[in-house]
């Protein structure tokens, strides 16, 4: 019965959700400065009579109370991220970004509209269940530090009673993410580590400046940094097991002066990103890079500055909760559940999944080999993903609330 009710309600709201998503896409906002997106979400929460409050950095907490006459203290948390990226959109879609250097290139517009749809469905079905569902609309997810999710946790979003620090936590948390490497309209759920672990590093080699005709009287920062760069390329082969995914990318280099080509510069700098499947590997790579920098600089008598940090942990899916969500997916359509490819992106939902049993599921939007990945200026999204998020979140929440 729930499946058919959810499908019917989803059909009612489909055009509205697509309109919401396109409005958000045309007006992307960065970080925690997302007042237009927040106001649009609140407009529909008001329209559908869903109670909510605003919290730090323009986040929104909405709650739906089941009215079925049973004593059920269970509470499910659903979460969607709302912020865009600092990217200049180069697609040709009619609803492309209207703001230069801002783009929804990670699907957060679909996550937001999809969870709004789940809110609509659950509100319409409030007489059919007991317990509570909390919707968390989160800004600033793209901040790699993960500090915003932690701030929301510190504000009490996981507490059943946010005004009582001694209150018990919500029972379950669920989030979704679109994925281009997963075929369109397929749903993927992993057990355990389900997102990558992002880390970052910066290296500055401090040598001795001098004339390019007398390199023996200098300490050549560029040459030293080049050796460090080359050594970094061998880390994965030498230190990480081949069945454990890892990626090291140099994303920034700087040295010298374009107008002073005859001077060996005192300083040279690179920055990079580390993505690993496991937290221990990220830390190991960070430590190995530090040793490489120290040893190579020591050989040539250079000073250095090295900074490494692991930004956030992997999102971890609870086995029991993921099975319930998988069952909900199969009930909606037994042919759409698949094992997802490895996802190396990070998500600060990890700050929630480390504290309460959680499920983070992937929604396929891939059309073929020529798909542009997330964070591309030509990224495009299959809007069928919106309704899938709505239906899976709402049915999974009802199934979990119904469990003893």
Mark where each language-model region is:
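Histidine/acidic-residue-rich, glycine-tolerant segments that coordinate divalent metal ions
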Residues: 85, 93-103, 109-110, 116, ...
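Acidic/His- and Gly-rich active-site-bordering loop/insert found
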Residues: 2-104, 113-130
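Non-cysteine beta-strand/loop elements that form the S-adenosyl-L-methionine
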Residues: 77-79, 201-203, 360-366
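A structural signal for isolated positions on well-ordered beta-strands in alpha/beta enzyme cores
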Residues: 53, 134-136, 305
